[in-house]
Design a protein with these regions (language model features):
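Transmembrane helical elements of multi-pass membrane transporters/channels
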Residues: 7-31, 194, 198, 202-205, ...
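Short membrane-interface helical motifs at transmembrane helix boundaries
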Residues: 99-121, 321-341, 459-463
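Helix-loop junctions and terminal segments of transmembrane helices
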Residues: 58-74, 279-297, 302-305, 369
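Interhelical loop/hinge segments that connect adjacent transmembrane helices in multipass membrane
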Residues: 1-5, 203-241, 299, 429-447
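Alpha-helical transmembrane segments of multi-pass membrane transporters/permeases
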Residues: 12-13, 136, 147-177, 357, ...
Length: 512
Protein backbone atom coordinates (compact mmCIF):
# COMPACT_ATOMS: atom_id res chain seq x y z
CA UNK A 1 0.00 0.00 0.00
CA UNK A 2 2.66 2.52 1.03
CA UNK A 3 4.75 1.58 -2.05
CA UNK A 4 1.80 2.36 -4.33
CA UNK A 5 1.32 5.77 -2.72
CA UNK A 6 5.01 6.71 -2.85
CA UNK A 7 5.82 5.35 -6.33
CA UNK A 8 2.74 6.84 -7.95
CA UNK A 9 3.19 10.15 -6.14
CA UNK A 10 6.81 10.47 -7.28
CA UNK A 11 5.78 10.10 -10.94
CA UNK A 12 3.08 12.74 -10.57
CA UNK A 13 5.40 15.08 -8.64
CA UNK A 14 8.09 14.97 -11.35
CA UNK A 15 5.66 16.05 -14.07
CA UNK A 16 3.95 18.56 -11.79
CA UNK A 17 7.25 20.20 -10.83
CA UNK A 18 8.21 20.47 -14.51
CA UNK A 19 4.79 21.97 -15.24
CA UNK A 20 5.11 24.49 -12.43
CA UNK A 21 8.57 25.59 -13.56
CA UNK A 22 7.13 26.34 -17.00
CA UNK A 23 4.12 28.05 -15.36
CA UNK A 24 6.42 30.28 -13.30
CA UNK A 25 8.22 31.35 -16.47
CA UNK A 26 4.85 32.00 -18.11
CA UNK A 27 3.61 34.13 -15.20
CA UNK A 28 6.92 35.96 -14.95
CA UNK A 29 6.66 36.99 -18.61
CA UNK A 30 3.05 38.04 -18.08
CA UNK A 31 4.01 40.20 -15.09
CA UNK A 32 6.91 41.71 -17.04
CA UNK A 33 4.67 42.60 -19.99
CA UNK A 34 1.62 43.90 -18.12
CA UNK A 35 2.51 44.42 -14.42
CA UNK A 36 -0.68 44.91 -12.40
CA UNK A 37 -2.32 46.86 -15.23
CA UNK A 38 -5.81 46.54 -16.66
CA UNK A 39 -4.89 44.14 -19.49
CA UNK A 40 -3.51 41.69 -16.95
CA UNK A 41 -6.70 42.12 -14.90
CA UNK A 42 -8.81 41.38 -18.01
CA UNK A 43 -6.82 38.23 -18.77
CA UNK A 44 -6.88 37.10 -15.13
CA UNK A 45 -10.64 37.66 -14.86
CA UNK A 46 -11.33 35.81 -18.13
CA UNK A 47 -9.11 32.90 -17.14
CA UNK A 48 -10.69 32.73 -13.69
CA UNK A 49 -14.20 32.71 -15.21
CA UNK A 50 -13.22 29.96 -17.65
CA UNK A 51 -11.57 27.86 -14.93
CA UNK A 52 -14.73 28.09 -12.84
CA UNK A 53 -16.67 26.32 -15.60
CA UNK A 54 -13.73 24.04 -16.42
CA UNK A 55 -13.68 22.81 -12.82
CA UNK A 56 -17.17 21.40 -13.41
CA UNK A 57 -15.66 19.05 -15.97
CA UNK A 58 -12.82 18.12 -13.64
CA UNK A 59 -15.42 16.83 -11.20
CA UNK A 60 -16.04 14.02 -13.69
CA UNK A 61 -12.64 12.54 -12.84
CA UNK A 62 -13.61 12.03 -9.21
CA UNK A 63 -17.17 11.02 -10.08
CA UNK A 64 -16.17 8.20 -12.44
CA UNK A 65 -13.40 6.69 -10.27
CA UNK A 66 -15.60 4.88 -7.65
CA UNK A 67 -18.10 3.67 -10.28
CA UNK A 68 -15.35 2.42 -12.60
CA UNK A 69 -13.40 0.86 -9.68
CA UNK A 70 -16.45 -1.14 -8.58
CA UNK A 71 -17.01 -2.53 -12.09
CA UNK A 72 -13.30 -3.21 -12.55
CA UNK A 73 -13.03 -5.05 -9.21
CA UNK A 74 -15.80 -7.37 -10.43
CA UNK A 75 -13.90 -8.02 -13.70
CA UNK A 76 -16.55 -6.36 -15.86
CA UNK A 77 -14.25 -5.01 -18.56
CA UNK A 78 -16.91 -4.67 -21.26
CA UNK A 79 -19.21 -2.73 -18.92
CA UNK A 80 -16.27 -0.46 -18.01
CA UNK A 81 -15.73 0.42 -21.67
CA UNK A 82 -19.45 1.01 -22.25
CA UNK A 83 -19.57 3.27 -19.18
CA UNK A 84 -16.64 5.35 -20.43
CA UNK A 85 -18.03 5.70 -23.98
CA UNK A 86 -21.48 6.70 -22.79
CA UNK A 87 -20.14 9.17 -20.22
CA UNK A 88 -17.86 10.84 -22.79
CA UNK A 89 -20.72 11.29 -25.27
CA UNK A 90 -23.29 12.60 -22.82
CA UNK A 91 -20.91 14.91 -20.94
CA UNK A 92 -19.47 16.39 -24.15
CA UNK A 93 -22.96 17.22 -25.44
CA UNK A 94 -23.82 18.92 -22.15
CA UNK A 95 -20.49 20.78 -22.25
CA UNK A 96 -21.31 22.13 -25.72
CA UNK A 97 -24.66 23.40 -24.43
CA UNK A 98 -22.91 25.12 -21.51
CA UNK A 99 -20.47 26.78 -23.94
CA UNK A 100 -23.33 28.23 -26.03
CA UNK A 101 -25.07 29.62 -22.92
CA UNK A 102 -21.82 31.01 -21.50
CA UNK A 103 -20.92 32.75 -24.77
CA UNK A 104 -24.36 34.42 -24.86
CA UNK A 105 -24.04 35.56 -21.23
CA UNK A 106 -20.42 36.79 -21.48
CA UNK A 107 -21.49 40.46 -21.40
CA UNK A 108 -23.62 40.26 -18.24
CA UNK A 109 -20.91 38.14 -16.56
CA UNK A 110 -18.35 40.92 -17.04
CA UNK A 111 -20.79 43.61 -15.85
CA UNK A 112 -21.70 41.73 -12.68
CA UNK A 113 -18.37 40.12 -11.73
CA UNK A 114 -15.89 42.76 -12.95
CA UNK A 115 -17.69 46.06 -12.51
CA UNK A 116 -14.46 48.08 -12.43
CA UNK A 117 -13.44 46.72 -15.86
CA UNK A 118 -16.96 47.10 -17.29
CA UNK A 119 -16.95 50.85 -16.58
CA UNK A 120 -14.56 51.41 -19.51
CA UNK A 121 -16.20 50.54 -22.90
CA UNK A 122 -12.89 49.50 -24.52
CA UNK A 123 -11.86 47.25 -21.63
CA UNK A 124 -15.40 45.86 -21.40
CA UNK A 125 -15.35 44.90 -25.09
CA UNK A 126 -11.95 43.24 -24.68
CA UNK A 127 -13.07 41.25 -21.65
CA UNK A 128 -16.26 40.01 -23.35
CA UNK A 129 -14.40 38.93 -26.51
CA UNK A 130 -11.63 37.17 -24.58
CA UNK A 131 -14.16 35.43 -22.36
CA UNK A 132 -16.07 34.09 -25.37
CA UNK A 133 -12.91 32.69 -26.93
CA UNK A 134 -11.75 30.99 -23.72
CA UNK A 135 -15.17 29.43 -23.04
CA UNK A 136 -14.64 27.14 -26.07
CA UNK A 137 -12.06 25.27 -23.95
CA UNK A 138 -14.86 23.71 -21.91
CA UNK A 139 -15.76 21.30 -24.75
CA UNK A 140 -12.47 19.42 -24.32
CA UNK A 141 -12.59 19.18 -20.53
CA UNK A 142 -15.23 16.43 -20.22
CA UNK A 143 -13.46 13.74 -22.33
CA UNK A 144 -10.10 14.78 -20.88
CA UNK A 145 -11.37 14.36 -17.29
CA UNK A 146 -12.99 10.98 -17.96
CA UNK A 147 -9.91 9.50 -19.64
CA UNK A 148 -7.70 10.82 -16.82
CA UNK A 149 -9.93 9.15 -14.21
CA UNK A 150 -9.83 5.79 -16.02
CA UNK A 151 -6.05 5.93 -16.37
CA UNK A 152 -5.63 6.70 -12.66
CA UNK A 153 -7.81 3.71 -11.78
CA UNK A 154 -5.43 1.55 -13.83
CA UNK A 155 -2.35 3.05 -12.10
CA UNK A 156 -1.32 4.86 -15.30
CA UNK A 157 -0.27 8.26 -13.97
CA UNK A 158 2.17 9.59 -16.58
CA UNK A 159 -0.38 10.87 -19.13
CA UNK A 160 -2.73 12.54 -16.58
CA UNK A 161 0.25 14.05 -14.76
CA UNK A 162 1.72 15.48 -17.98
CA UNK A 163 -1.44 17.38 -19.01
CA UNK A 164 -0.61 20.64 -17.27
CA UNK A 165 2.98 20.55 -18.53
CA UNK A 166 1.78 20.28 -22.13
CA UNK A 167 -0.72 23.15 -21.83
CA UNK A 168 1.75 25.39 -19.99
CA UNK A 169 4.31 24.83 -22.76
CA UNK A 170 1.72 26.07 -25.27
CA UNK A 171 1.13 29.22 -23.19
CA UNK A 172 4.87 29.83 -22.73
CA UNK A 173 5.59 29.43 -26.46
CA UNK A 174 2.77 31.86 -27.25
CA UNK A 175 4.11 34.48 -24.84
CA UNK A 176 7.68 34.21 -26.13
CA UNK A 177 6.95 34.25 -29.87
CA UNK A 178 3.42 35.49 -30.54
CA UNK A 179 2.15 37.73 -27.73
CA UNK A 180 3.53 40.95 -29.24
CA UNK A 181 1.89 40.08 -32.59
CA UNK A 182 -1.57 38.86 -31.53
CA UNK A 183 -1.85 40.27 -28.01
CA UNK A 184 -4.29 39.20 -25.31
CA UNK A 185 -6.92 37.95 -27.79
CA UNK A 186 -4.46 35.53 -29.33
CA UNK A 187 -3.69 34.27 -25.84
CA UNK A 188 -7.33 33.23 -25.61
CA UNK A 189 -6.86 31.02 -28.68
CA UNK A 190 -3.69 29.58 -27.11
CA UNK A 191 -5.74 28.63 -24.03
CA UNK A 192 -8.21 26.70 -26.22
CA UNK A 193 -5.33 24.88 -27.95
CA UNK A 194 -3.80 24.09 -24.56
CA UNK A 195 -7.00 22.43 -23.34
CA UNK A 196 -7.27 20.38 -26.54
CA UNK A 197 -3.72 19.10 -26.05
CA UNK A 198 -4.54 18.17 -22.44
CA UNK A 199 -7.25 15.90 -23.83
CA UNK A 200 -5.14 14.52 -26.68
CA UNK A 201 -2.21 13.50 -24.46
CA UNK A 202 -4.43 10.95 -22.65
CA UNK A 203 -5.68 9.20 -25.79
CA UNK A 204 -2.64 6.97 -26.56
CA UNK A 205 -2.41 5.69 -22.96
CA UNK A 206 -6.17 5.05 -22.94
CA UNK A 207 -5.96 3.05 -26.17
CA UNK A 208 -3.15 0.94 -24.72
CA UNK A 209 -5.64 -0.32 -22.12
CA UNK A 210 -7.48 -1.95 -25.02
CA UNK A 211 -10.36 0.54 -25.07
CA UNK A 212 -11.79 2.19 -28.19
CA UNK A 213 -14.33 4.99 -28.29
CA UNK A 214 -17.70 4.13 -29.85
CA UNK A 215 -20.62 6.52 -29.93
CA UNK A 216 -23.08 5.68 -27.16
CA UNK A 217 -25.91 7.80 -25.80
CA UNK A 218 -27.95 6.17 -23.04
CA UNK A 219 -29.27 8.41 -20.29
CA UNK A 220 -30.76 5.38 -18.51
CA UNK A 221 -27.42 3.61 -18.04
CA UNK A 222 -27.00 2.64 -14.36
CA UNK A 223 -23.36 3.68 -14.21
CA UNK A 224 -24.08 7.04 -15.83
CA UNK A 225 -26.98 7.66 -13.45
CA UNK A 226 -24.72 6.81 -10.51
CA UNK A 227 -22.17 9.33 -11.79
CA UNK A 228 -24.95 11.87 -12.32
CA UNK A 229 -26.26 11.43 -8.77
CA UNK A 230 -22.84 12.12 -7.26
CA UNK A 231 -21.76 14.72 -9.81
CA UNK A 232 -23.31 17.85 -8.28
CA UNK A 233 -21.71 17.56 -4.82
CA UNK A 234 -18.44 16.39 -6.40
CA UNK A 235 -18.41 19.23 -8.93
CA UNK A 236 -19.30 21.74 -6.24
CA UNK A 237 -16.53 20.52 -3.95
CA UNK A 238 -13.92 20.22 -6.72
CA UNK A 239 -14.84 23.74 -7.86
CA UNK A 240 -14.55 25.26 -4.38
CA UNK A 241 -11.15 26.82 -4.95
CA UNK A 242 -12.32 28.42 -8.20
CA UNK A 243 -15.69 29.49 -6.73
CA UNK A 244 -14.02 30.98 -3.64
CA UNK A 245 -11.46 32.82 -5.76
CA UNK A 246 -14.23 34.05 -8.02
CA UNK A 247 -16.07 35.49 -5.00
CA UNK A 248 -12.82 37.06 -3.78
CA UNK A 249 -12.16 38.44 -7.27
CA UNK A 250 -15.58 40.10 -7.34
CA UNK A 251 -15.06 41.58 -3.85
CA UNK A 252 -11.55 42.74 -4.75
CA UNK A 253 -12.66 44.27 -8.06
CA UNK A 254 -15.25 46.38 -6.24
CA UNK A 255 -12.42 48.06 -4.31
CA UNK A 256 -9.43 48.07 -6.70
CA UNK A 257 -9.07 46.08 -9.94
CA UNK A 258 -5.32 45.63 -9.36
CA UNK A 259 -6.10 43.50 -6.29
CA UNK A 260 -7.34 40.85 -8.76
CA UNK A 261 -3.77 40.48 -10.03
CA UNK A 262 -2.31 40.43 -6.49
CA UNK A 263 -4.78 37.70 -5.51
CA UNK A 264 -4.02 35.73 -8.66
CA UNK A 265 -0.24 35.70 -8.26
CA UNK A 266 -0.42 34.89 -4.54
CA UNK A 267 -2.85 32.08 -5.22
CA UNK A 268 -0.63 30.69 -7.99
CA UNK A 269 2.31 30.55 -5.60
CA UNK A 270 0.41 28.69 -2.86
CA UNK A 271 -1.33 26.44 -5.38
CA UNK A 272 2.02 25.52 -6.90
CA UNK A 273 3.12 23.76 -3.71
CA UNK A 274 -0.36 22.33 -3.11
CA UNK A 275 -0.52 20.87 -6.62
CA UNK A 276 3.07 19.59 -6.73
CA UNK A 277 2.82 17.62 -3.51
CA UNK A 278 -0.75 17.28 -2.20
CA UNK A 279 -2.46 16.72 -5.55
CA UNK A 280 0.25 14.20 -6.46
CA UNK A 281 -0.35 12.20 -3.28
CA UNK A 282 -4.13 12.50 -3.45
CA UNK A 283 -4.26 11.56 -7.15
CA UNK A 284 -2.69 8.22 -6.23
CA UNK A 285 -4.52 7.77 -2.92
CA UNK A 286 -8.08 8.35 -4.20
CA UNK A 287 -8.25 5.35 -6.59
CA UNK A 288 -6.60 3.26 -3.86
CA UNK A 289 -9.23 4.32 -1.30
CA UNK A 290 -12.05 3.60 -3.77
CA UNK A 291 -10.61 0.16 -4.50
CA UNK A 292 -10.20 -0.67 -0.79
CA UNK A 293 -13.78 0.45 -0.11
CA UNK A 294 -15.07 -1.71 -2.99
CA UNK A 295 -13.25 -4.68 -1.41
CA UNK A 296 -14.47 -3.70 2.09
CA UNK A 297 -10.89 -3.50 3.42
CA UNK A 298 -11.61 -0.74 5.92
CA UNK A 299 -8.55 -1.40 8.10
CA UNK A 300 -6.23 -0.80 5.15
CA UNK A 301 -8.48 2.10 4.10
CA UNK A 302 -7.87 3.96 7.37
CA UNK A 303 -4.17 3.12 7.19
CA UNK A 304 -3.92 4.59 3.67
CA UNK A 305 -5.71 7.75 4.80
CA UNK A 306 -3.46 8.36 7.81
CA UNK A 307 -0.35 7.53 5.79
CA UNK A 308 -1.32 10.05 3.10
CA UNK A 309 -1.89 12.82 5.66
CA UNK A 310 1.53 12.11 7.19
CA UNK A 311 3.24 12.36 3.81
CA UNK A 312 1.47 15.68 3.19
CA UNK A 313 2.57 17.07 6.57
CA UNK A 314 6.17 15.88 6.17
CA UNK A 315 6.52 17.83 2.94
CA UNK A 316 4.17 20.80 3.22
CA UNK A 317 4.62 21.92 6.84
CA UNK A 318 8.29 22.91 6.34
CA UNK A 319 7.49 24.26 2.86
CA UNK A 320 4.81 26.54 4.33
CA UNK A 321 7.09 27.86 7.07
CA UNK A 322 9.96 28.32 4.64
CA UNK A 323 7.74 30.22 2.20
CA UNK A 324 6.51 32.48 5.00
CA UNK A 325 10.11 33.38 5.91
CA UNK A 326 11.29 33.84 2.31
CA UNK A 327 8.09 35.27 0.83
CA UNK A 328 9.67 38.58 -0.24
CA UNK A 329 12.64 37.13 -2.20
CA UNK A 330 10.39 34.39 -3.61
CA UNK A 331 7.94 36.91 -5.06
CA UNK A 332 10.80 39.16 -6.21
CA UNK A 333 12.42 36.29 -8.12
CA UNK A 334 9.02 35.29 -9.49
CA UNK A 335 7.66 38.67 -10.58
CA UNK A 336 10.05 41.63 -10.23
CA UNK A 337 10.87 42.71 -13.78
CA UNK A 338 9.52 45.11 -16.37
CA UNK A 339 6.25 46.70 -15.27
CA UNK A 340 6.14 44.73 -12.01
CA UNK A 341 8.00 46.97 -9.54
CA UNK A 342 9.46 46.29 -6.07
CA UNK A 343 6.46 48.07 -4.53
CA UNK A 344 4.17 45.59 -6.31
CA UNK A 345 6.33 42.73 -5.02
CA UNK A 346 6.06 44.01 -1.43
CA UNK A 347 2.31 44.32 -1.80
CA UNK A 348 2.01 40.79 -3.21
CA UNK A 349 4.29 39.21 -0.59
CA UNK A 350 2.27 40.86 2.20
CA UNK A 351 -0.89 39.35 0.72
CA UNK A 352 0.84 35.98 0.27
CA UNK A 353 1.67 35.71 3.99
CA UNK A 354 -2.03 35.41 4.86
CA UNK A 355 -2.62 32.83 2.12
CA UNK A 356 0.24 30.49 3.02
CA UNK A 357 -1.79 28.47 5.60
CA UNK A 358 -4.11 27.40 2.77
CA UNK A 359 -1.33 25.17 1.38
CA UNK A 360 -1.80 22.77 4.30
CA UNK A 361 -5.51 23.45 4.78
CA UNK A 362 -6.47 22.68 1.17
CA UNK A 363 -4.19 19.63 1.09
CA UNK A 364 -5.75 17.97 4.13
CA UNK A 365 -9.25 19.08 3.18
CA UNK A 366 -8.80 17.56 -0.27
CA UNK A 367 -7.95 14.11 1.08
CA UNK A 368 -10.90 14.27 3.52
CA UNK A 369 -13.27 15.15 0.67
CA UNK A 370 -11.95 12.26 -1.40
CA UNK A 371 -12.64 9.93 1.52
CA UNK A 372 -16.31 10.93 1.46
CA UNK A 373 -16.41 10.45 -2.34
CA UNK A 374 -15.01 6.93 -1.99
CA UNK A 375 -17.51 6.20 0.81
CA UNK A 376 -20.35 7.43 -1.44
CA UNK A 377 -21.39 9.94 1.22
CA UNK A 378 -22.15 13.00 -0.87
CA UNK A 379 -24.48 14.60 1.67
CA UNK A 380 -21.60 15.72 3.91
CA UNK A 381 -19.66 16.91 0.87
CA UNK A 382 -22.61 19.00 -0.32
CA UNK A 383 -23.14 20.61 3.10
CA UNK A 384 -19.45 21.43 3.43
CA UNK A 385 -19.29 22.89 -0.07
CA UNK A 386 -22.24 25.19 0.55
CA UNK A 387 -20.74 26.23 3.90
CA UNK A 388 -17.45 27.08 2.17
CA UNK A 389 -19.12 29.34 -0.38
CA UNK A 390 -21.30 31.11 2.20
CA UNK A 391 -18.48 31.56 4.73
CA UNK A 392 -16.09 32.93 2.09
CA UNK A 393 -18.50 35.79 1.45
CA UNK A 394 -19.67 36.31 5.05
CA UNK A 395 -16.13 36.48 6.47
CA UNK A 396 -14.46 38.44 3.67
CA UNK A 397 -17.03 41.04 2.66
CA UNK A 398 -17.22 42.93 6.00
CA UNK A 399 -13.41 42.88 6.34
CA UNK A 400 -12.64 44.46 2.97
CA UNK A 401 -13.25 48.03 4.14
CA UNK A 402 -11.46 47.58 7.47
CA UNK A 403 -8.17 45.97 6.41
CA UNK A 404 -8.12 46.36 2.63
CA UNK A 405 -7.05 43.75 0.10
CA UNK A 406 -5.40 41.47 2.70
CA UNK A 407 -8.93 40.70 3.90
CA UNK A 408 -9.32 38.53 0.79
CA UNK A 409 -6.51 36.23 1.94
CA UNK A 410 -7.57 36.26 5.60
CA UNK A 411 -11.17 35.40 4.75
CA UNK A 412 -10.04 32.59 2.44
CA UNK A 413 -7.78 31.08 5.12
CA UNK A 414 -10.32 31.31 7.96
CA UNK A 415 -12.99 29.69 5.80
CA UNK A 416 -10.61 26.83 5.02
CA UNK A 417 -9.87 26.18 8.69
CA UNK A 418 -13.55 26.09 9.70
CA UNK A 419 -14.66 23.84 6.83
CA UNK A 420 -11.72 21.45 7.31
CA UNK A 421 -12.79 20.88 10.91
CA UNK A 422 -16.38 20.41 9.70
CA UNK A 423 -15.15 17.54 7.49
CA UNK A 424 -12.93 15.81 10.02
CA UNK A 425 -15.48 15.02 12.73
CA UNK A 426 -18.15 13.40 10.50
CA UNK A 427 -15.43 11.27 8.85
CA UNK A 428 -14.05 10.26 12.24
CA UNK A 429 -17.52 9.07 13.22
CA UNK A 430 -18.31 7.30 9.92
CA UNK A 431 -15.21 5.11 9.67
CA UNK A 432 -14.36 4.96 13.40
CA UNK A 433 -11.09 6.76 12.70
CA UNK A 434 -8.70 6.81 15.64
CA UNK A 435 -5.47 8.77 15.80
CA UNK A 436 -3.27 6.72 18.12
CA UNK A 437 -0.34 7.79 20.27
CA UNK A 438 2.19 6.83 17.59
CA UNK A 439 0.50 9.06 15.02
CA UNK A 440 0.53 12.00 17.45
CA UNK A 441 4.18 11.30 18.26
CA UNK A 442 5.02 11.33 14.53
CA UNK A 443 3.21 14.66 14.14
CA UNK A 444 5.20 16.13 17.04
CA UNK A 445 8.44 14.93 15.43
CA UNK A 446 7.52 16.65 12.15
CA UNK A 447 6.76 19.91 14.01
CA UNK A 448 10.06 19.73 15.94
CA UNK A 449 12.03 19.05 12.74
CA UNK A 450 10.32 22.02 11.07
CA UNK A 451 11.25 24.34 13.96
CA UNK A 452 14.86 23.09 13.88
CA UNK A 453 14.94 23.93 10.15
CA UNK A 454 13.21 27.30 10.31
CA UNK A 455 15.51 28.98 12.86
CA UNK A 456 18.75 28.81 10.80
CA UNK A 457 16.84 29.64 7.59
CA UNK A 458 15.45 32.78 9.26
CA UNK A 459 18.90 33.79 10.56
CA UNK A 460 20.58 33.24 7.17
CA UNK A 461 17.88 35.26 5.42
CA UNK A 462 18.19 38.21 7.82
CA UNK A 463 21.99 38.14 7.61
CA UNK A 464 21.89 38.19 3.81
CA UNK A 465 19.33 40.99 3.54
CA UNK A 466 21.30 43.17 5.97
CA UNK A 467 24.14 43.32 3.42
CA UNK A 468 22.47 42.95 0.01
CA UNK A 469 19.48 44.56 -1.71
CA UNK A 470 16.66 42.25 -2.82
CA UNK A 471 16.90 42.50 -6.58
CA UNK A 472 15.98 39.54 -8.79
CA UNK A 473 19.51 38.08 -8.90
CA UNK A 474 20.07 38.34 -5.13
CA UNK A 475 16.59 36.94 -4.45
CA UNK A 476 17.37 33.79 -6.46
CA UNK A 477 20.69 33.47 -4.60
CA UNK A 478 19.16 33.74 -1.12
CA UNK A 479 16.37 31.29 -2.03
CA UNK A 480 19.00 28.81 -3.23
CA UNK A 481 21.21 29.17 -0.14
CA UNK A 482 18.34 29.01 2.35
CA UNK A 483 16.68 26.20 0.40
CA UNK A 484 19.78 23.98 0.39
CA UNK A 485 20.52 24.57 4.08
CA UNK A 486 16.86 24.18 5.00
CA UNK A 487 16.39 20.86 3.18
CA UNK A 488 19.61 19.37 4.60
CA UNK A 489 18.84 20.45 8.17
CA UNK A 490 15.24 19.21 7.90
CA UNK A 491 16.27 15.80 6.51
CA UNK A 492 18.91 15.36 9.21
CA UNK A 493 16.34 16.30 11.87
CA UNK A 494 13.77 13.83 10.50
CA UNK A 495 16.32 11.00 10.34
CA UNK A 496 17.63 11.81 13.83
CA UNK A 497 14.08 11.85 15.22
CA UNK A 498 13.41 8.51 13.43
CA UNK A 499 10.28 9.42 11.52
CA UNK A 500 9.09 6.11 9.99
CA UNK A 501 7.76 7.61 6.76
CA UNK A 502 11.21 8.99 5.90
CA UNK A 503 12.71 5.51 6.38
CA UNK A 504 10.05 4.08 4.06
CA UNK A 505 10.83 6.62 1.34
CA UNK A 506 14.60 5.99 1.65
CA UNK A 507 14.13 2.19 1.47
CA UNK A 508 11.91 2.44 -1.61
CA UNK A 509 14.48 4.69 -3.35
CA UNK A 510 17.28 2.21 -2.47
CA UNK A 511 15.30 -0.73 -3.88
CA UNK A 512 14.34 0.93 -7.17
Amino acid sequence: MKNKIINGSVIVMIFTIASKVVALLRDSLMASNFGTGTENSIFTFSMRSTMLLVSIGYGLTMAIVPVYSKLDSNNKGKECEELVNNTITVSTIFAAIIVVIAVILAGPIVKVMASDIAMNPVYYSQAVSLLRIMFISIIFVAPQSILAGVLQCNNKFIAPASMSLCSNLVYLIYQVFLLKIYGIMGYGVAVVIGFFIMFAVNVPAYRKLGYRYKFSFNLKDRGLRKIGESLFPIVLSSSLVQISLYILTAIGASVDSSSIVILDYSNKMTMMFYEVFAIAINMVTYPLLSSLKAQNEMGEYKGALIKSVKYILIVLLPVSIGLAILRLPVMAAYLMRGEFTFESVERTSSFLLFMIPTILILSIKDILLRCFFSLDNNRIVLKNSIATIVLTFIITYPLRRMIGENSLAIGYTLTGIVTMIMLYYPLKKEIALKINAKDLKDLLKIVIATIIMSVPVYLIYNLFTSYFALNTKNSILIIGICGIFGVLIYLIALITLRVDEVKEIINIIKNR
